[in-house]
C-alpha cells in the first residue's frame, strides 16, 4: 500500500472522487503545509495550511500516474489558490509526496501535462512534512451529506462528469 496527499480545492470534492475509485483503500481529509495543529477555522483564517486528501491505494490495482491523471481532470492545475468559487491559499493545487520515486513521477507528469495545457501549471510538488487529520465531520462528507447544498451544486456534477468521461 502507498499514500499520496493531494490538494486541489475543497477537500470534500477531491475525496468524493477518489473514495469511489477501484484500488483506493482509504481516503482521509486533512490539512498540511502550515502552522501546527490546525482547525478548520484556523485554516479558513489563513494559517497557511492547505485542505488535502490523503489517498491510501494499492499500486497493484491503480498507479500513481492514474491517480494524478484523474486529479488533473477534477481541478484546474493552472489556477493559483482558487478552484471555482473557493478562493484562498487553503485551496492551492499541490502534490505532497512521501518518497523520491513519487516526486520524480509527479515532476515528469507535470512536465508532460504542461505540453497539453495552454496556461502555466502552478501545481506545487512538495515532500510531506506534516499532516493533520481534519475534524470528523469533514470525513467522507459527500457520502454522509449527499443532499447538502454544496454537495448538490458542486460535488455531484463533478462526479457525473467524471463518470461520463
From Swiss-Prot:
The active site is at residue 10. It is an enzyme of class 1 (oxidoreductase). It holds the Pfam family PMSR. One of its GO terms (molecular function) is peptide-methionine (S)-S-oxide reductase activity. One of its GO terms (biological process) is protein modification process. Keywords: Oxidoreductase. The keyword Oxidoreductase applies. The keyword Oxidoreductase applies. Its EC number is 1.8.4.11. InterPro entries: Met_Sox_Rdtase_MsrA_dom, Met_Sox_Rdtase_MsrA_sf. It catalyses: L-methionyl-[protein] + [thioredoxin]-disulfide + H2O = L-methionyl-(S)-S-oxide-[protein] + [thioredoxin]-dithiol; [thioredoxin]-disulfide + L-methionine + H2O = L-methionine (S)-S-oxide + [thioredoxin]-dithiol. Has an important function as a repair enzyme for proteins that have been inactivated by oxidation. Catalyzes the reversible oxidation-reduction of methionine sulfoxide in proteins to methionine. NCBIfam families: msrA. Belongs to the MsrA Met sulfoxide reductase family. This is Peptide methionine sulfoxide reductase MsrA. It comes from Campylobacter jejuni subsp. jejuni serotype O:2 (strain ATCC 700819 / NCTC 11168).
